[in-house]
């Protein structure tokens, strides 16, 4: 009886010790549009540890100051891909950039170059289905970015296992700008 009680208490202590830790800090999850007066550059993002893999030609993306594809490691040293779009202001990001971003986000994303409004970098916005798929599913593609946030004058497109994780990844990178 004592042995069962001791084992139960040890098990309970382990569960309580591990149960409070989450993989992300959900208390810092940002709204989709926030920090309206913030003005950021790609250098602000690279100063957080964001690594640029590719800078896109934005000559056909009206009023954009630049778009960069790259990755960033969060506090748990886990790397995620992002696309960062910078505009002169949040107002211009909303007016000129929102439709282009919403077109490539989520399940209904436009991922064919022939159908996309802004073709530059479209190959980096696609993912192939996992290796466990077979048949026609094995060759299907899906959107890499499941969510985005508009943080000041920047638009941050984020990956994640689902919408909640993607939003948290957006928030984690954006919140790191203020550290």
Predicted regions and their residues:
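C-terminal motif of bacterial Sec signal peptides marking the signal peptidase cleavage site
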Residues: 15-17
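N-terminal "mature-domain start" segment
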Residues: 19-76, 167-179
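Second-shell loop/turn segments in exported
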Residues: 27-32, 80-86, 154-163
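Repetitive helical segments and hydrophobic/amphipathic motifs
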Residues: 11-12
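Positively charged n-region of N-terminal signal peptides that target proteins for export
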Residues: 1-4
